Amino acid sequence: MPNISVNELVDSTNSDLPREIKTSLAKNILSSIKDPLEAKEKFFTLTNNLNINKQREVINATGTILHTNLGRAPVDMSYSGMYANIEYDLSTGSRGDRNKYLTESMKTLLEAESVAFVNNNASSLYLTLLCLFRKYNKDSVIVSRGEIIEIGGSYRLPDIISETGMKLIEVGTTNKTRKKDYEEALKVNPNAVLLKVHRSNYSISGFTEDVSIKDLADLKENNDTFLIHDLGSGLVVDTVFLAKHNISIFEKEPKVQQSLKDGADIVMFSGDKLFGSIQSGIIAGKSSIILSIKNFSIFRTYRCSAIVLHELQKTTEMYLKKSEESIPFWSLLIKQYKDLEQRIKKIVGDNNYDYEIVTGKSVIGGGTLPNSTLDSPILLLNVNDINQIVEKLLKNTPPIIARITDGKISFDLRSVFENQDGEIAKFLNSI
């Protein structure tokens, strides 16, 4: 028998974890460890580890705006989570269409016949292809070899296609794919669909050739097929807004609206990347296909919650009202170098840290614009024990996620909201 009881072990730390969790941990530990001191050490480590990894707000000082490990696009959550008219028509006092206003708003923004919303963009592609396979008798997917992608979390395009029951047909080469390649593949596989995938997280340069959505749309018109464009990133912002803020890094980034105009039947993208909203997948395009997807038996298993729909509604309204500056993602991206530099100087104040301010490169992140960066002033802090300071940053309330650059701690305010500056200043004053 162990020389320490479950209750004694639970009471050996002042962790604020629920007692039920601590009791479960204690029982597991005491089932294999009999020595009281060893059991206490193990219990302290496990409870501390579990407690520090509760989901909480952090300060992102990495300079990666769409930080995948920190939730991608930040959102200003205004929804209370209380009852909402998600499927209730207030004009008639009876059951209504789900997210009717959001649907009309998004259709207007994207200039699309119809739209559907799911939990992420991987679901968008999976459901679309599965629907075309089951309801339209399409049996294969034609994709350029240069677009057979893998994204974070081991998501591989061939695996998704295989899961739908369709066959992957590769055309062209890694660096060169021509219209003729698609044309010949369609002749051999008349029940195939055309899929174009945006290479958002990598680029191919040099001796290259690609086929545009317009050219594929022309090819589609002469064949009984569909053209699907998996855009992933989801750029919808007005070019006037980009010009106003002198932002040029999106010049070659395809826009959702343009893809639809150029003839894609279905375009899909992530809600939490360049769209700047909450995690979701948005499917836009031909109303007949969208309706088939919505009426598909498993669509319900991928649909969005009230909170997600509310945040998408709010973001869509901001675009329609030309209030892009109010979208947190865009508010960070458009910050001017000199303004960020002034904020750093204010944070540092008159303190005698060993620091310097240098020009660094911020990135968009989230698997988008792999070759593009933004010049930003960086606060480099030189400390004696860098590991100790990093540990303090992570245990701070709120935690501050910084980078290590050339043996120094790096703070990039490009991804920090101005109302968080005081927390960084407070931390620096404490070390």
Set out the residue ranges of the language-model regions.
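Conserved PLP-enzyme active-site core in the AAT-like
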Residues: 93-316
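Structural motif of enzymes handling amino- and sulfur-group chemistry
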Residues: 288, 296-297, 304-351, 358-361, ...
